[in-house]
Amino acid sequence: MTDLNFPVVDYHVHLSKDLGIEEAVALADRRGMEFGIVQHPGAAYDLETDADLRRYVAHLRTYPVYVGLQPTHLGWAAHFGEEARAQLDYVLMDADTLPWEGDYFLLWLHDNFIEDMDVFVERYMDHIVAILSEEPIDIFARPTFLPINFARHYEEIWTEARMRRIIDLAVERGIALEIAENVRVPSVEFVRMAKEAGATFTFGTNGRNPNAGNFHYCCAVAAEVGLTGEDMLRLPRSLG
């Protein structure tokens, strides 16, 4: 349970050896909330074809959870038919897999190093804009997340103009913005600006263990900004 006066959903939960589907369902019940389960598409996850996607959805449909997908690369939707993708409750995507010099820069790794912050920020913004402009997604996860070597420059990097660009694109396409518990982004200022612009929000822990649904930062930001149930994403399908 939370102290908020609206129902809470953790839309960013992964199953793992530490959190199977039965454990996730029981945990959500104990916390008095609902979970959305996401999986990455790709060979490593046996999720490459329409048949794989239908099988994944059908399995999770037997449980009281929302069924999501978390692609990591631009153009992911070309690998699945529109009918198969329509079986999902939602698609969540972040900008953490950044195309870089013919490879990918993985923002979450702790040993990353890029010498020129300005070059990074320019490419990162271009990547975010591409996702919000082109990708068929419902939730933009971890907005304004920064790699560890630039995180101390958060306020310098996330100028009002850059935050406004992200917010406006999300609002224009009806993409919800995640408040990410585990990395404590975006900032209160960003959320306040987004609320004033008419954005919708989700909470996410990126949990792969019993910490899923354990919200502190999300609740604090929601309370400070004055988020209500009307500000939160609500999916058409009911679990109850």
Q: Where are these predicted regions, by residue range?
A:
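Charged catalytic cores and adjacent phosphate/nucleic-acid-binding surfaces used
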Residues: M1-F6, L19, Y154-G240
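Divalent metal-dependent hydrolysis catalytic cores, especially in the metallo-beta-lactamase
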Residues: F6-S16, E23-D46, P64-Q70, D138
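Conserved, mostly hydrophobic/aromatic
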Residues: H12, A28, V91, R142, ...
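Active-site environment of divalent metal-dependent phosphoester hydrolases
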Residues: S16-G20, G42-Y45, L74-G75, T97-G102, ...
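Short, structured coil segments at secondary-structure junctions
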Residues: R31, A86-Q87, A197, V225
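Conserved residues at the C-terminal ends of beta-strands
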Residues: V38-Q39, D94, P143, L235
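Extended substrate/RNA-proximal surfaces in nucleic-acid metabolism proteins
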Residues: L47-E172, L227
